[in-house]
Each structure stands twice: as structure tokens, then as C-alpha cells.
């Protein structure tokens, strides 16, 4: 369970529009003392990318970069970075919807995330919004 959250604002990117503060560093502290940091940039000039790494006591775990071909040609080597989320998550959203349909039809007995999970996410979101405004660590409602 998360008990405290904070949001920090590094130097803003020149690509942020209006009053948007971008990037943002989100910090979340769990009851057991685990510290989670999430770096968010809504105006990444180079494209859409999700990176995730767990740093643990005995090693690290990193999600793989989305499977994209690496092209070597004309003295260059690289791969495309998608413009948005649609290509990366279309299959995941289809599978999630199918799982829900299967549950409604009695084909599986585990419904997945429910109202209580959504309520917990809302409490964390409320604390994060407050932390964006105050610049302080904020307590997540119990």
C-alpha cells in the first residue's frame, strides 16, 4: 500500500505548452518503505516510449523495449520509436476486454481489477494532484 506521494518539477522542456509543467518526477512511498519513482514527460520530442526498471536488493528487472526491428543501413543503425501508444497497447486492450467478456459469460471466475482497486487508485491520484500544487509530500487517504 502507498502511504505518501510527492511530485517534483525539473527544468521544463521547451516543448511544453502553456502552463503545462513537463517533465514531472512522481515519488511514491509504500507502507513497507519501498520508494517508487516515475518520470513523466508528455512532450517527448522523439516519440512515445515506456521504460520500466525495478532496482532490488539482489539485482534489477527491466521490461524489454517494444519489439521493433533494428535497421542497419547507410552507415546508420537504429529503430523507430512510435508516435503514440496505439501500436504498443492495442493487443493488450483487446485481451483485457476479452477477459472481461469471458468473466461475464462465466468462463473465468476472476474478474480482474474491481471497484475497490479503482477507489484506491483515485485516493492515490487525489494525493498526487495535491502534491503537484503544494510541492510537499502528501499522505494518501487510508
Feature-to-residue mapping (PLM):
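A generic structural motif
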Residues: 29-31, 55, 74-76
Amino acid at each position: 500500500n502507498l502511504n505518501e506521494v510527492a511530485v517534483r518539477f525539473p527544468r521544463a522542456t521547451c516543448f511544453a505548452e502553456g502552463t503545462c509543467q513537463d517533465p514531472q518526477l512522481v515519488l511514491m512511498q509504500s507502507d513497507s518503505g519501498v520508494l517508487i519513482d516515475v518520470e513523466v514527460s508528455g512532450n517527448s520530442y522523439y516519440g512515445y516510449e515506456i521504460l520500466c526498471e525495478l532496482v532490488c536488493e539482489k539485482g534489477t528487472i527491466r521490461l524489454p523495449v517494444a519489439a521493433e526491428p533494428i535497421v542497419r543501413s547507410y552507415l546508420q543503425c537504429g529503430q523507430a520509436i512510435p508516435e503514440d501508444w496505439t501500436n504498443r497497447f492495442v493487443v493488450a486492450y483487446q485481451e483485457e476486454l476479452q477477459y472481461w467478456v469471458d468473466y461475464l459469460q462465466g468462463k473465468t471466475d476472476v474478474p480482474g481489477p474491481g471497484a475497490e482497486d479503482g477507489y484506491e487508485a483515485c485516493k492515490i491520484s487525489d494525493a498526487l494532484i495535491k502534491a503537484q500544487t503544494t510541492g510537499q509530500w502528501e499522505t494518501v487517504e487510508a
